[in-house]
Amino acid sequence: MVVGGASGLSAAGGGDFYYEDNDSYRKYFRPFAEKYHFKGAFAGMMHPWKTREEYWGYLATFLHTTQTAPVRHSYLDLDALLKGKDFFILTTNQDTQFVKLYPEEKVAEIQGDHRFFQCAACCTDDTWDAVKPVADMVAAMGSDTKIPTDLIPRCPHCGGEAFPWVRGYGNFLQGKKYEEQSKKFLAMCWNTKTAKFCSWSWALAE
């Protein structure tokens, strides 16, 4: 069984702060909402930040919110339905909910993952850990909305800024890590009765 999981699953479990000024948005992003007046977490990605320190203060808050969130009840409800079944997860979600619940080999995150950084300029095919740098930025920021300059994450190869390995609001790197995710899905397809349909559908999408 192939299970497709998208943003509605997270929103149903309380991760509904992306598009509107609601209680969960205010819970996690109140300092930014009150100071910069944008409504919804995704709006912050388009905000005209005056400094990189402010920008990364916001981005670190965004990433930390999803990295540290517990498994949401909507995912636990889905898990109950999947008990005893042979399944594979294909998701466009980047918020790490599925990989908190299931082994990595059972999940293909084809739109990226908030746990990793890439080079913003895509100078390298590498991705690397974002969890500790994000935690350090949030700790250093405290109740402020900006981070110290020396904590702005950098690419270890070119020295330019890093960026979350996610599609949608940056220069998404479709390199080694992306290929790993797509190969997991294709391998599952070839091992099932739906091999031809899955593989051709994926090939056409690419």
Each language-model region and where it sits:
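Conserved catalytic alpha/beta core of Sir2/sirtuin-type deacylases, generalized to analogous enzyme cores
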Residues: 1-206
